[in-house]
């Protein structure tokens, strides 16, 4: 049926051969995020999937990125979305990821092996996907200026758009429901999650169609609204309809996100609180180096050593600390005591300057899963900072850099890590830094090993009544801090520049990394043990209540008060929230009872500083104005009196007293 191309037809897009059945979709839209203890910079294997109307995956793309930072262009073919779709597409029996059906079409007439002439025009037939000729005509239809396609959102649309229908009408029951597509009126929306358009021009798709391939690729791009949504793991769905004469054919498709950990940790065996509790291994005798070379052509396969026990790991930390200290300061290791601190914090960080490496793809060490966030409670020095560093931590920054735009991975140099507000990590994602208020400082990790002189240790064993002063404990971070990066430039000429290549320093770094991994495992084991213990206790409680059911339960039989298990983590969290609420209420009550003059000082901190600054000069000026005239008058009167006295003295000096004349009788 002919129609004008200058206006949209006001037609009902519901299938006239079947009534519109109301469909109520109950969807649980949860926010899918990583585990609460994971770092936001952790890299996952992310897969974006495009599904057909039966929720089958027909196209997918994968990559290694942090969650909610990778928004690629999705390029499925239009005919891929029609697999197991309505019969007029011709692919109702076609399985996903199968080859395009039908023989190719030929130019200049039919020939053996060809279905029909590619140049044969499309008459009254609806574009289909079952042959190369049909796919070519479908491409021509979607690229025409007066035809094309439009897309309508599914259940995630606003409530006022409920009249747009369900999957039976491809969510496009009436005009105005479309939010994107390729049509002459250019449908658009400010709230929908995606935009859809053709990925190839018509000229490019012609040859692809003639070669009997999928030749109607789409390009689906995420909008700003879609990038803010974190419920992609449950999937979102749309309907697509062709804008042609008569009834517009259509289909439904969806987009969902799947992610998995690149390095899952699967526990095998028992679940002790402290993992790998093994006795201390006996020291092996030192072997002299052999000059015998292995035969050429036979590579030596490295043997994987079993994981070290707790005692071995602690001893390796002290041994590595001694080797590093002996290499840099041999005079301090002539006679000394190195003590490993048994209480937290077990590690301290030293901020350093260094040159990190920039990667466009996630390196292997960025994909290591971390079930818990490890934080540093003590960081000293000044080093390299990245991100929006708050004023409370700017003292740790010698140089502050802003994160570059784009998706990059900043890997810390060897022997260092990034201490971020979200925890320790070997590499950081610039996308996460740009999306959040996270900041990171480049630090060296040093175990809490204290250095004591022999006099201090001997004094502990001496029985003396004298009270000695508290000794100053030097930690390994104070003695060797900044040696990985900053100490290299400072150690030129002293031999410390070669420390990075020595086996001693590598031994210390390896011991630190092993111990950090075991600390994380211990935290996980403690968490699992507490959960298991609570389950056992609650199960035993239920069993005892059933046994003493006739007596009224366990508490009635024991004649004691009933005790219940409480998750103190949640209680503490709720208590802190209530405490903050009460403090806010008291603060508001206190402010409401204050006068305007008192409140002026509280609301304007700068006003208090201004008053305290100018109050002194103002008081002095006021005193001068009040008592200045009186003091000035007194001073003038005093000067006048002194001048009068001086004038009198001058006048008296010009005259002398005459002697009296005596007359003789």
Swiss-Prot record:
Glycans are attached at residues 45, 199, 326, 358, 365, 398, 434. Residues 538-554 are annotated as: Immunosuppression. A motif (CX6CC) lies at residues 555-563. A motif (CXXC) lies at residues 336-339. The record marks 469-470, 649-650 as: Cleavage. CDD domains: HTLV-1-like_HR1-HR2 (cd09851). InterPro entries: FMuLV_rcpt-bd (IPR008981), TLV/ENV_coat_polyprotein (IPR018154). The chain crosses the membrane at residues 611-631. A motif (YXXL motif) lies at residues 655-658. GO terms for molecular function: identical protein binding; metal ion binding. Gene3D superfamilies: 1.10.287.210, ENV polyprotein, receptor-binding domain. Keywords: Cleavage on pair of basic residues, Coiled coil, Disulfide bond, Fusion of virus membrane with host cell membrane, Fusion of virus membrane with host membrane, Glycoprotein, Host cell membrane, Host membrane, Host-virus interaction, Lipoprotein, Membrane, Metal-binding, Palmitate, Signal, Transmembrane, Transmembrane helix, Viral attachment to host cell, Viral envelope protein, Viral penetration into host cytoplasm, Virion, Virus entry into host cell, Zinc. One of its GO terms (biological process) is symbiont entry into host cell. Residues 632-665 are cytoplasmic. Residues 472-492 are annotated as: Fusion peptide. Residues 34-267 are annotated as: Receptor-binding domain (RBD). Zn(2+) binds at residue 117. Residues 500-537 form a coiled coil. Residues 1-33 form the signal peptide. Disulfide bonds join 79-129, 105-118, 106-114, 152-172, 164-177, 209-215, 336-339, 336-563, 366-420, 385-397, 427-440, 555-562. The mature envelope protein (Env) consists of a trimer of SU-TM heterodimers attached by a labile interchain disulfide bond. The activated Env consists of SU monomers and TM trimers. The surface protein (SU) attaches the virus to the host cell by binding to its receptor. Interaction with HECT ubiquitin ligases activates a thiol in a CXXC motif of the C-terminal domain, where the other Cys residue participates in the formation of the intersubunit disulfide. The activated thiol will attack the disulfide and cause its isomerization into a disulfide isomer within the motif. This leads to SU displacement and TM refolding, and is thought to activate its fusogenic potential by unmasking its fusion peptide. Fusion occurs at the host cell plasma membrane. The transmembrane protein (TM) acts as a class I viral fusion protein. Under the current model, the protein has at least 3 conformational states: pre-fusion native state, pre-hairpin intermediate state, and post-fusion hairpin state. During viral and target cell membrane fusion, the coiled coil regions (heptad repeats) assume a trimer-of-hairpins structure, positioning the fusion peptide in close proximity to the C-terminal region of the ectodomain. The formation of this structure appears to drive apposition and subsequent fusion of viral and target cell membranes. The 17 amino acids long immunosuppressive region is present in many retroviral envelope proteins. Synthetic peptides derived from this relatively conserved sequence inhibit immune function in vitro and in vivo. This is Envelope glycoprotein.
């Amino acid at each position: 049926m002919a129609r004008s191309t200058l206006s949209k037809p006001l037609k009902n897009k519901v299938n006239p051969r079947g009534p519109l059945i109301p469909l109520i979709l109950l969807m649980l839209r949860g926010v899918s995020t990583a585990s609460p203890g994971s770092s936001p910079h952790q890299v996952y294997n992310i897969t974006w999937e495009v599904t057909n109307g039966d929720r089958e995956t027909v196209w997918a793309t994968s990559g290694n990125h942090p969650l909610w930072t990778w928004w690629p262009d999705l390029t499925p073919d239009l005919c891929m979305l029609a697999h197991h779709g309505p019969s007029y597409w011709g692919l109702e029996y076609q399985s996903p990821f199968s080859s395009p059906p039908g023989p190719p079409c030929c130019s200049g007439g039919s020939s053996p092996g060809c279905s029909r002439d590619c140049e044969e025009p499309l008459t009254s037939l609806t574009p289909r996907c079952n042959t190369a000729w049909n796919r070519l005509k479908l491409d021509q239809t979607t690229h025409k200026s007066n035809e094309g396609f439009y897309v309508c959102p599914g259940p995630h649309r606003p409530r006022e758009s409920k009249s747009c229908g369900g999957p039976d009408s491809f969510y496009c029951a009436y005009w105005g429901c479309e939010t994107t597509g390729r049509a002459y009126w250019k449908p658009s929306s400010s709230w929908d999650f995606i935009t859809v358009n053709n990925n190839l021009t018509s000229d490019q798709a012609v040859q692809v169609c003639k070669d009997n391939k999928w030749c109607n690729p789409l390009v689906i791009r995420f909008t700003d609204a879609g990038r803010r949504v974190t419920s992609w793991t449950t999937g979102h769905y749309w309907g697509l309809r062709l804008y042609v004469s008569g009834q517009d054919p259509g289909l439904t498709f969806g987009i969902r996100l799947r992610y998995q950990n690149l390095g899952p940790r699967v526990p095998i065996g028992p679940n002790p609180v402290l993992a790998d509790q093994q006795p201390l291994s006996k020291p092996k005798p030192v072997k002299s180096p052999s000059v015998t070379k292995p035969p050429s052509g036979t590579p030596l396969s490295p043997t994987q050593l079993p994981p070290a026990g707790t005692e071995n790991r602690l001893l390796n930390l002290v041994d590595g600390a001694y080797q590093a200290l002996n290499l840099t300061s041999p005079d301090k290791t002539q006679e000394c005591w190195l003590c490993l601190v048994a209480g937290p914090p077990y590690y301290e960080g030293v901020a350093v300057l260094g040159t990190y490496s920039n990667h466009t793809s996630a390196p292997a060490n960025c994909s290591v899963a971390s079930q818990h966030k490890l934080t540093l409670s003590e960081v000293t020095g000044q080093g390299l900072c990245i991100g929006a560093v708050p004023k409370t931590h700017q003292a740790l920054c010698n140089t502050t850099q802003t994160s570059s735009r784009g998706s990059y991975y900043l890997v810390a140099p060897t022997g260092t890590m990034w201490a971020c507000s979200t925890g320790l990590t070997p590499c950081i994602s610039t996308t996460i830094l740009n999306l959040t208020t996270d900041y990171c400082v480049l630090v060296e990790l040093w175990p809490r090993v204290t250095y004591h002189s022999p006099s201090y240790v001997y004094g502990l064993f001496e029985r003396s009544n004298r009270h000695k002063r508290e000794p100053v404990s030097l930690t390994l971070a104070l003695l060797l801090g900044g040696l990985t990066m900053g100490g290299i430039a400072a150690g030129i000429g002293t031999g410390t520049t070669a420390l990075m290549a020595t086996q001693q320093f590598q031994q210390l770094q390896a011991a630190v990394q092993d111990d950090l991994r075991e600390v994380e495992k211990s935290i996980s084991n403690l968490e699992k043990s507490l959960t298991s213990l609570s389950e056992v206790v609650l199960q035993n409680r239920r069993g005892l209540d059933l046994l003493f059911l006739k007596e009224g339960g366990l508490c009635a039989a024991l004649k004691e008060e009933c005790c219940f298990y409480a998750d103190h983590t949640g209680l503490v969290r709720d208590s802190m929230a209530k405490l903050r609420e009460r403090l806010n209420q008291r603060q508001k009550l206190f402010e409401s009872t204050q006068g305007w003059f008192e409140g002026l000082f509280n609301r304007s901190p700068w006003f208090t500083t201004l008053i305290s600054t100018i109050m002194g000069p103002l008081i002095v000026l006021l005193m001068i104005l009040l008592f200045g005239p009186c003091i000035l008058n007194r001073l003038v009167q005093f000067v006048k009196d002194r001048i009068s006295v001086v004038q009198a003295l001058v006048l008296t000096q010009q005259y002398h007293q005459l002697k009296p004349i005596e007359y003789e009788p």
